[in-house]
Amino acid sequence: RKFGLAMTVGCILLGMGAASASAAEPITASADCCTFTAPSYTQAAGETSTFINPVDATTFHNAVANDLGPDKKPLFASGTEPAGGSSPVQGTQYLAPGTYGFYCTIHGSAMDGELVVDSSGTAVPRPSVKLSVLNQKLKAVRNQGKLKVKVTGTTASSGISISASVGSKKLGSVSKVNVAAGASKTVVVKLTSAGKKALKNKKKVSVSVKGSVPFGKPASASRKIH
């Protein structure tokens, strides 16, 4: 009986803990244009907020951060939603505790609000990658029309875009690359016609690669190949 009572009490306490756990307040547009339903919304660090445009809304809305992140794009942003639509506010999971302004890009700064991130959670590490141009023969790159680049995930990263160039001339690019934290993969950048032309009759070149990842810092690398 004592064991059963202890189990019952434990389950009750567990349920209370779950009920009191922090949950991000949805950022919600007002039905009447053009405001949000509250001046501020709260979430724990590490959570991904949600934007909601109510079913009786009269127009499209979104929620986009005022400030830019390390990728030179908004710190966070929802999709632009019709009446009854909703979408995750991507980027909020990386925010440190603090207060962040946002607005609807359709209706301007008159439709704005604040997102308050508290310290009851832990922010997700921002996407981060390292790049390196693999050792390869220039003749093979030129003839095969392919440049091999190694991508290493310092943290889990998705939607990576990589471009390769020689001086001011672009060789080619690849996008939608994903890599897990601590993992590496070889990515093939296919040369464009202009890229192949840039390597024609060259005996040695310095190849530069640049990578961008949503919500993370850009990465770069270079190597001389001959």
What are these regions (language model features)?
Residues 80-86, 177-185:
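Short proline/glycine- and polar residue-rich coil/turn motifs
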Residues 6-16:
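Bacterial N-terminal signal peptides
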Residues 21-131:
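Extracytoplasmic copper-binding redox domains, predominantly the cupredoxin/blue-copper superfamily
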Residues 87-93, 184-193:
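Exposed aromatic-hydrophobic patches
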Residues 52-56, 152-154, 192:
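Acidic, Ser/Thr
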Residues 125-174, 203-226:
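Extracellular glycosylation-rich, acidic/polar low-complexity regions of adhesion-
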Residues 96-100, 195-207:
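Short glycine/proline/serine/threonine-rich loop/turn segments at secondary-structure transition edges
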Residues 54, 105-109, 192, 210-216:
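Beta-strand-rich extracellular modules
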